[in-house]
Amino acid sequence: MSRKTPLNMVRNIGIAAHIDAGKTTTSERILFFTGMSHKIGEVHDGAATMDWMEQEKERGITITSAATTCFWKDHQINLIDTPGHVDFTIEVERSMRVLDGAVAVFCAVGGVQPQSETVWRQANKYRVPRMVFVNKMDRVGANFFNVEEQIKNRLKANPVPIQIPIGAEDEFKGVIDLIEMKALVWEDDTKPTDYVTKDIPAELLEKAQEYRAKMIEAVAETDDALMEKFFGGEELSVEEIKRGIKAGCLAMTMIPMLCGTAFKNKGVQPLLNAVVDYLPAPDEVAAIRGELEDGSEVVVDSTDNGEFAGLAFKIMTDPFVGQLTFVRVYRGQLESGSYAYNTVKGKKERIGRLLRMHSNKREEIKVLYAGEIGAVVGLKDTLTGDTLAGEKEHVILEKMDFPDPVISVAVEPKTKADQEKMGIALQKLAQEDPSFRVSTDEESGQTIISGMGELHLEIIVDRMLREFKVEAEVGQPQVAYRETIKKSVEQEYKYAKQSGGRGQYGHVFLRLEPLEPGSGFEFVNDIKGGVVPREYIPAVEKGCQEALQSGVLAGYPVEDVKVTLFDGSYHEVDSSEMAFKLAASMGFKEGARKAGAVILEPMMKVEVETPEEYMGDVIGDLNKRRGQINSMDERAGNKIVTAFCPLAEMFGYSTDLRSQTQGRATYSMEFDHYEEVPKNVSEEIIKKRNG
């Protein structure tokens, strides 16, 4: 079977945005105009085809990235929906891995929001070429040119409008296409799909010429031949302009800007044309790199001919077909009924049915080709971030890094009968979401779930009830504290037991030093002349690592410590790995007590947007929560306060903020860094932990 859509006509794109910029509506309209969904789903009435999990319908926020295939001008567009809420940045990160290009949607009123900055940073990290769609041009306070300024100043990017709006707010009629120099006008609101091409209104001609000149200059900079033409005063043809925009977009030196209002169906078809014209095909972006089993690096080119290599980027439980694993094929082809090798787990997987998802319908297919995205039914051992490969070349594609959770709660089922069901439910949810962890508290035997924020865990508990029919009681949220040391110390420890028969003997000298925040643990072997034999060194490191699990102040994990083993002694008969492990572990604990151990707490970056009259209350409240105010700005007539606040003080913040501001303020919060806890708070934490 040969492929229906040539590789150069495939587009893998994501729609990325802040929570209320209208991302789902934009995705919906794309599906509508590409002829996939006939009735337009509205987020307001909870029927959007992209948002296919029930809670999303209720909360009106998009949680899981569903990959949906649609067609426009003979191009296959695989649309990967990314969530905009900060607790789900892991989802965004995961979808950025498999995208070739992105459409960043901004609200014409709200502009660049804190969440947009996070998503933008992730897109930069994975070098994803993108364009901007300024949405909600019909809203009161809409201003396309303000958003352009904010993208320059806040995101430090180079936005180049290739359209400008005709009017704004209720007067928003359409857009001026600066490439063709024509006005595209939506005249009849009852027929949203039809627009007319007209001459540019006289009062906007000067502005259009000014912005076209800026665009041409940006285009000329992408190519020497175009630059010569430009400086020679020659006109660039439409083809040359388009070629230049694409080159700038792929090199990420310019970001084409378009506008419209997805809700009112204005500006969506030109956006689709731009996706096809300017965003890259799989073979136009840098090839993904992988490593072989011997550690050597290989480049995995996008081609149908090589051996199969693909990345599992998302796992979902589907009520009808069971577990779905979403796979992006980078090289070769994946056929249903064949076998693939999971190179991360070292296991062979049988490929069952292959599905292509159309927002909420599934189409069964026989083959997935390079550059395509689909879902595999029935994989047993494959998790998010695993590589699937052919039999010959066991390549591992770039691994994904997932952050450690910062918040935990204890959960128990309402009825004892649900205990086993809850275990299965949590295990399945943890398979789908690597930033969610499940563990058991050794002392109390309680099940502990951990994640990236309160909303994250609320949704997990909610999904247990909806999808697995398990009702759970949730305990008080617990903060993931850490411990570290402040000064360097040297510590000797001798572990010796002689009581008839064979004894135990291990003797170590350790140097403990604090490291920069975020460095983790480092172990250095500095033994000279074999005073501690080589075979016992790993046991010393292991002993230190075990001691790190539970700190000396309150039993929290210890981090950012360097341990050097610099001296010691051993006994020909009585020394053993066990003895050295115990000596190191106890030596580490004694040393840590002298090294000024302190407790660290997760600090959240909090941004509150509030009407001016509540500004004083908001700041006063953040100060009460031990917040450090960073900056105060203005956006769309509101005040913006940015602060770092300890997570421990932020539980229930949304309710308090609502009552302080009569529901008129909004906030976003994401983990930023760990910081030392003040002494009085530290004493309380220790007292609570040690009873």
Swiss-Prot record:
Residues annotated for GTP binding in this entry: 17-24, 81-85, 135-138
Family stated for the protein in its record: Belongs to the TRAFAC class translation factor GTPase superfamily. Classic translation factor GTPase family. EF-G/EF-2 subfamily.
Annotated compartments: Cytoplasm
InterPro entries, sorted: EFG_II, EFG_III, EFG_III/V, EFG_IV, EFG_V, EFG_V-like, EFTu-like_2, G_TR_CS
Alphabetic keyword roster: Cytoplasm, Elongation factor, GTP-binding, Nucleotide-binding, Protein biosynthesis
Listed Pfam families: EFG_C, EFG_III, EFG_IV, GTP_EFTU, GTP_EFTU_D2
Organism of derivation: Campylobacter fetus subsp. fetus (strain 82-40)
Protein name, entry field: Elongation factor G
One BP term from GO: ribosome disassembly
Regions that span the bilayer: none
Function, in words: Catalyzes the GTP-dependent ribosomal translocation step during translation elongation. During this step, the ribosome changes from the pre-translocational (PRE) to the post-translocational (POST) state as the newly formed A-site-bound peptidyl-tRNA and P-site-bound deacylated tRNA move to the P and E sites, respectively. Catalyzes the coordinated movement of the two tRNA molecules, the mRNA and conformational changes in the ribosome.
SMART domains: EFG_C, EFG_IV
GO MF: GTP binding; GTPase activity; translation elongation factor activity
NCBIfam families the record matches: EF-G (TIGR00484), PRK12740.1-3 (NF009379), PRK12740.1-5 (NF009381), small_GTP (TIGR00231)
Any one GO cellular component localisation term in the record: cytoplasm
